[in-house]
Amino acid sequence: MTHYDVVVLGAGPGGYVAAIRAAQLGLSTAVVEPKYWGGICLNVGCIPSKVLLHNAELAHIFTKEAKTFGISGDASFDYGIAYDRSRKVSEGRVAGVHFLMKKNKITEIHGYGRFTDANTLSVELSEGVPETPLKVTFNNVIIATGSKTRLVPGTLLSTNVITYEEQILTRELPDSIVIVGAGAIGIEFGYVLKNYGVDVTIVEFLPRAMPNEDAEVSKEIEKQFKKMGIKILTGTKVESISDNGSHVLVAVSKDGQFQELKADKVLQAIGFAPNVDGYGLDKVGVALTADKAVDIDDYMQTNVSHIYAIGDVTGKLQLAHVAEAQGVVAAEAIAGAETLALSDYRMMPRATFCQPNVASFGLTEQQARDGGYDVVVAKFPFTANAKAHGMGDPSGFVKLVADAKYGELLGGHMIGHNVSELLPELTLAQKWDLTATELVRNVHTHPTLSEALQECFHGLIGHMINF
């Protein structure tokens, strides 16, 4: 069969989830994917990086905090074994995607698909299968082609100038590295590499690390990374990158002052651009935004009624869980099933998984004030949380921003041990318009890190208990 109710172009977190939901709703479904089943996330992104981050955390504990926990003796850390574990976990999750495709009777088409008309894809099949392109027709299609790494203007990749993909797929570590970009990817790789003995310098063009986070969170992560020995150069522009084969020279400037950084490797991590080229979108009239992303409405529908788009290619919030949520909505919209529109991507959760974690949703304090809200803020430090002390890591805080008039949450900003696990309570509260007065009555288990949320709920209405 080469005609389907729904064809999904791309098998990343959004694509495969959309396919499963479509199949659950009784639609004949196929997925077209040339390389990474499970997407960047499962193969060379979210999943293997979290394995490496956990290994790095253990290395940090044994090298920097062993005495605190009564641990003594020599320990060695083999990055090659950590790498092997990351690949094993990744491969297991990818196998899980194939299992789910089979379980839900979804057809896998291994190849590169492009539109030839509004209801047809021509698929160049992968090696080991017939070379003649496969013609696949459909009633509806979901574009889930993801994104590609943006590079510093005027620079190129080379043997020693790499992206996250090359770094996460190597067992060998450099002695030194310059990471361009202090967003989530730059921060996470900086944490991993430093804890395995690499000399790390992070260069950020904007005035602070993690510039999309609340200013107080940025200040705290800079402090914690400085304690680890990671150098962060903020407000610094990369002028050029030169790879001579044995090392890389990075020319940077700040306030009219120039310097040259020398390292074994340079990792470019300044962000991602939607993958819109080479798929024939122009042939079917799919509209793009000014930022060259596929333009969608709140139900993931493009300007062509039977063509939908999800994930990074839409240029919304480029995170795996956002793509998954979009995929569910797209499939339900196609099937005519009950669904819920997605509109305000500012309120989606986001996290960076170094230790301490950085986790947030919604408006920063400054954004809320700039937006004209009458703002109330509560901030609770983990130095006042018993569980954090028991874990040996009381760094960081929870900061909540609320509308003073109605008491509803506008944003949450956290830095601390595993605070990414605290986000769902906050985003659920925001989505269903719960107020601080209501939230404070939700009893939190003692002792847990989540008690910091309860303290902030108390703080928003003027009576924090334990601080």
Swiss-Prot record:
This is Dihydrolipoyl dehydrogenase. It is an enzyme of class 1 (oxidoreductase). Homodimer. Part of the PDH complex, consisting of multiple copies of AceE (E1), DlaT (E2) and Lpd (E3), and of the BCKADH complex, consisting of multiple copies of BkdA/BkdB (E1), BkdC (E2) and Lpd (E3). The gene is lpd. Disulfide bonds join C41-C46. Keywords: Cytoplasm, Disulfide bond, FAD, Flavoprotein, NAD, Oxidoreductase, Redox-active center. NAD(+) binds at G181, A182, G183, A184, I185, E204, A269, I270, G271, F272. The active site is a redox-active disulfide bond. GO terms for molecular function: dihydrolipoyl dehydrogenase (NADH) activity; flavin adenine dinucleotide binding. It comes from Mycobacterium leprae (strain TN). One of its GO terms (biological process) is 2-oxoglutarate metabolic process. FAD binds at E33, P34, K35, Y36, W37, G38, G39, I40, C41, K50, G113, D312, A320. One of its GO terms (cellular component) is cytoplasm. The lineage of its organism: Bacteria, Bacillati, Actinomycetota, Actinomycetes, Mycobacteriales. The active site is at H446 (proton acceptor).
